[in-house]
């Protein structure tokens, strides 16, 4: 469950971990990353999201690009390279949750064998200020994209997707998914009944078909189940993702790699 440690103590814990962390990189490592920057720019524009890459060696963001439309773009941009500037943009009620999530992920990944550290995708939500100073709801994916010469995490990519322009109170949630197995880790005690999967196989099937544009009647015919059963699966997914509508639930499912 979410820790009861104060936000100020969490900040101290998190920044201590970052400042004491060491990795070994060379100019050649940076040259390889710079050659691939254009791919991140293209991905941001196509997927309408913002992408930031944090350098655990330099202790700062070395890349930022936003394809999110101007009105809802975050107040975080290329001029803000340091972590404390990112956290200054978060909703005060969400800062502790985000810090706790990052600390637990950091400890989890550094305890894994080097060959497994790039296999995980963290997905969590929060509220952040946009350019106009209003709070919007975002979902962030975080993953290690490059390791140093000793196999230790070096570059961490954060991808923010706009979930809603409304800053109403939201249910904070986080999921760590193994991209190879599809299994959930670390925050399983926060899932219903201690499950290792957020959705059942049937729920995945239903939402994959919804993502293709099929309505409940067509899905029922395709899966040989009743329309009532399809609608029940819809409601279960909305409940599990704590989302307000099918579109938001689809965003979650996509970012978790389920559809």
Question: Can you describe what each PLM-predicted range is?
Answer:
Residues 28-85, 179-187:
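PAS-family sensory domain signal
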Residues 46-50, 103-124:
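PAS/PAS-like sensory domains
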Residues 85-109:
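PAS/GAF/H-NOX family sensory domains and closely associated sensor/linker modules
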Residues 113-143:
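Per-ARNT-Sim (PAS) sensory domains and their PAS-associated C-terminal
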Residues 141-156, 164-170:
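Short loop/turn elements at sensory-signaling interfaces that couple input to output
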Residues 179-202:
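Regulatory hinge/linker segments at domain boundaries
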Residues 202-206, 216:
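The N-cap/first-turn positions of alpha helices
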Residues 213-248:
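Recognition helix of helix-turn-helix DNA-binding domains
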């Amino acid at each position: 469950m979410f820790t009861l440690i104060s936000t100020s103590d969490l900040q101290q814990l998190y920044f201590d971990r970052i400042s004491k962390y060491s990795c070994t990189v060379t100019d050649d490592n940076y040259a390889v990353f710079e050659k691939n920057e254009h791919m991140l720019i293209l991905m941001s524009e196509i997927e309408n999201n913002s992408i930031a890459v944090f350098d655990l060696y330099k202790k700062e963001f070395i890349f930022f690009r936003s394809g999110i439309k101007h009105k809802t773009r975050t107040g975080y941009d290329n001029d803000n390279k340091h972590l404390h500037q990112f956290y200054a943009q978060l909703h005060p009620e969400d800062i502790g949750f985000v810090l706790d999530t990052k600390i637990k992920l950091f400890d989890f990944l550094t305890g894994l064998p080097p060959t497994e550290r790039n296999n995980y995708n963290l997905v969590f939500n929060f509220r952040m200020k946009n350019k106009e100073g209003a709070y919007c709801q975002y979902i962030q994916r975080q993953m290690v994209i490059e390791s140093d010469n000793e196999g230790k995490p070096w570059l961490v990519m954060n991808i923010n997707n706009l979930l809603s322009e409304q800053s109403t109170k939201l249910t904070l949630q986080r999921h760590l998914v193994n991209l190879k197995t599809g299994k959930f880790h670390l925050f399983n005690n926060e899932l219903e009944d201690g499950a290792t999967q957020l959705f059942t196989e049937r729920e995945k099937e239903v939402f994959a078909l919804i993502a293709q544009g099929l309505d409940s009647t067509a899905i029922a015919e395709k899966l040989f189940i009743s329309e009532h059963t399809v609608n029940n699966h819809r409601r279960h997914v909305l409940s599990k993702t704590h989302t307000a509508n099918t579109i938001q639930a689809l965003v979650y499912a996509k970012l978790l790699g389920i559809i």
